[in-house]
Regions:
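Actinobacteria-biased recognition of intrinsically disordered, low-complexity terminal regions
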Residues: 1-8, 94, 230-233
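Transmembrane helix-loop-helix hairpins at the membrane interface
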Residues: 109-233
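Juxtamembrane helix-loop-helix connectors linking adjacent transmembrane helices
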Residues: 54-120, 133, 137-138, 171-179
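Structural signal for membrane-spanning alpha-helices in multi-pass inner-membrane proteins
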Residues: 17-23, 43-51, 81-86, 157, ...
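Alpha-helical transmembrane segments in multi-pass membrane proteins
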Residues: 2-54, 64-71, 111
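Hydrophobic, aromatic-rich alpha-helical transmembrane segments
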Residues: 5, 29, 33, 37, ...
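Membrane-active amphipathic alpha-helices enriched in small hydrophobic residues
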Residues: 37-46, 72, 77, 190, ...
Length: 233
């Protein structure tokens, strides 16, 4: 009976994380910062309660050095690629974002040094490449685990993608009207789902969630800097 209660509570907690993910775009920035980190912690605890060990969560202490090595090498490559794309005429408009270009220097520094590395990269990797990938792999196997965690990662980006419509350059490039806007959202989901597969492979090869977290952070921070540069000239 106790085991059944524990498992029911764990699944209910994961349902709460999903509900938070669906509504988080409407929350104030400070609430999202705390909420993402709490959601990651709750998901990890739930997955652990459902039988996933530390290695399955990408949290085995002996693998973090490998995670840093893999993440450092791949993160540097990704950052260089994004920086290069941001300077090319055909792709530069995709980086424009009115919200980012409107940030003060102080706000931009906080975003790049705290919010993106912790709220986005660390929290999302602990959630999706830690808890979700670990649990899905444990229940469904390696291939299905990667597929499920990556698709859910893509869907996690629907609320912020909807919130960003009209402010980012992606919607402008895709064209106006409902078709262009939903095309931009669909493209965001597809791109982040593919990124989820890459992040999952990094976690598999390194054995640590640190690797995808470093690459995720490098990708987003470089993209943020590119968006700020595109908006300020």
């Amino acid at each position: 009976v106790e085991d059944r209660i524990r498992r029911t509570a764990a699944w209910a907690a994961l349902g709460g994380v999903a509900a938070y993910g669906a509504g988080r775009a409407r929350l104030p920035a400070a609430a999202r910062f705390t909420g993402n980190l709490v959601a990651a912690g709750v998901a990890l605890a739930a997955a652990s309660a459902l039988g996933v060990d530390r290695a399955g969560l990408g949290l085995a202490a002996g693998r973090h050095v490998q995670g840093i090595r893999w993440g450092g090498m791949a993160g540097g490559t990704v950052a260089a690629a994004v920086a290069g794309l941001a300077t090319i005429g055909p792709t530069r408009p995709y980086f424009a974002d009115e919200r980012i270009s409107a940030h003060s220097n102080r706000r931009a520094a906080v975003e790049a040094s705290l919010r993106i590395p912790l709220e986005t990269a660390a929290a999302e990797e602990l959630l999706f490449r830690g808890a979700v990938l670990g649990l899905a792999t444990d229940r469904l196997g390696d291939v299905a685990g990667v597929a499920v965690s990556s698709v859910l990662f893509g869907l996690w980006h629907v609320p912020p993608a909807l919130d960003a419509l009209g402010a980012s350059g992606v919607a402008d490039v895709a064209g106006g009207g409902p078709v262009g806007r939903w095309g931009a959202v669909t493209g965001t989901v597809a791109a982040t789902s593919v990124a989820g597969v890459v992040f999952a492979e990094l976690r598999r090869r390194s054995g640590s969630v640190v690797a995808p977290a470093l690459v995720h952070g490098a990708l987003n921070v470089t993209g943020f800097a590119a968006a700020r540069r595109a908006g300020t000239g």
